[in-house]
Amino acid sequence: MIGQLGTLLMTFREVFPRDATFQWFVVAVLGFIVRLDHHGVSSSIRWLRIRPSTYETFLAFFRSSALKFDTILRHWQTLVSQRCTTRTSSGSIVLIGDGLKVAKEAACMPGVKRLHQESENSGKAPWIVGHHFGIVGMLVGNKEKAFCIPLAAELHEGAVALRQLQQKQPPTVVGVEKITVVTLMGNLLKTVAKQLAEPCVAVLDAYFAVGPTFLIAKTLCGREGQRLLHIITRAKDNVVAYEARPVAYSGRGRPRKYGRKIRLETLFSRAEDFAPMQVCIYGELKTVSVLCLDLLWRPIQENLRFVLVKDGTATFILMCSDLTMAPEEIIKLYATRFKIEVTFKMLKHIIGGLRYHFWTTAWRDPKGKSLAVDQLSDMLDRSKRLIADAMNAIEAFVGIAMIATGLLQMLALEHAEKIRSLHRWWMRTYSSEIPSEEMVKTVIQHEFYHNFRRFKHTAIYRIIQAKRRQQAPELMEMAA
């Protein structure tokens, strides 16, 4: 599997102007996969057996201006879309977006702030101090198994001043700059869809069922004026929509602007309006009752497709901006949203992609407080640069960890039979014929620690061995 991994990594060579930067990128990706503990950059140095004297150089790689991570992500997004994407019946790529919060109590780490977590999981504290990332992934797979390959991530909470330091453009809603968690997610989806240059459907949870999400997606159009980004999201419980305005009008006063107001939650009591439908939800074929309505939604002044679903005693409402999509497909696509939660688990616990420790003494804000925009005017240029470099390093670390996770998922889909033949360790159950990311990681680790010399003719072997060789001054120091 190291040979196949090396082939995929070598496709990134063209986006690095310097060979040294590319080599450290390979070290970073392979380090995430083969290391046996999650202690930041030092884990990769230790388990790859790279010279300890290169530790500072490895750290500098993440902060380096030579690391053009936007270019790397664009190549990564194109690579994934060309190899293993899942498409809708109309040929659209399926994107999934969500937020991920990680506890970080470092006093000198940029972007750390007090965050609220809503979860029924008793292991999650209601309040933490840390980072909130917005992450967008692409649904890939086949009939056997599906993955959500992460494509892009950036800090989404407490990021107003930091985005200025990083020289990132703020999102706009109807021509007005507006930076919130919702608009940043909408802007990230728009950026990814624009790079893919193909029709996309983004699946989001109810937190993003607000006007700015749909308004930002609406602005991305192709050369012929067709929309390139549609949104599917779960509606809030109190959602209200309107019927079409009556064409005929007679009487006194101003003509009505909207039709009859409908509180959609009340429609669940009208059982006779619902029709039975078979849909695939979480891998199981189920019969649910569905009511599909195209109604006007005031926040965007346009029609949306509302799909009301009764699954036994459970009820929920889905919203879709694509009025041509069938209700069963809308339900099926929303059911795949949980795949990004599985990716978060792999990114956090298997890859250790959030175990970074980048900080700077230029960040002196009280713990849990965001950097305000008005503070930038009194800040030294050197402090601004140090904070921006630290933030870029954090996002680069998470981004490279995402690429490592995605590469494992791609290998699982493309080389499933070979991986299962190489995996000789006992497992109580196999979820499908397609191996998990952890199984692929175990196979690569075994090859690396026991049979790495078999790959001595590959570029990945030469890069790692070059980082292991001791230079003359180091040999003299050991001799002394």
Predicted regions and their residues:
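Single, function-defining residue in the core of a domain
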Residues: 1-13, 108, 147-480
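Gly/serine-rich nucleotide phosphate-binding loop at the start of the catalytic core
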Residues: 1-63, 69
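Structural motif
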Residues: 16-24, 123-129, 386-398
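Generic alpha-helix structural propensity
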Residues: 24, 36-40, 53-57, 67, ...
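Contiguous, well-ordered alpha-helical segments that form the cores/surfaces of helical PPI scaffolds
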Residues: 26-32, 137, 401, 405
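Short alpha-helix boundary/capping elements
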Residues: 33-38, 49-52, 66, 104, ...
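Glycine/proline-rich, flexible active-site/cofactor-binding loop segments
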Residues: 40, 47-53, 139-143, 152-158, ...
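Active-site-proximal, Lys/Arg-enriched surface segment
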Residues: 64-159
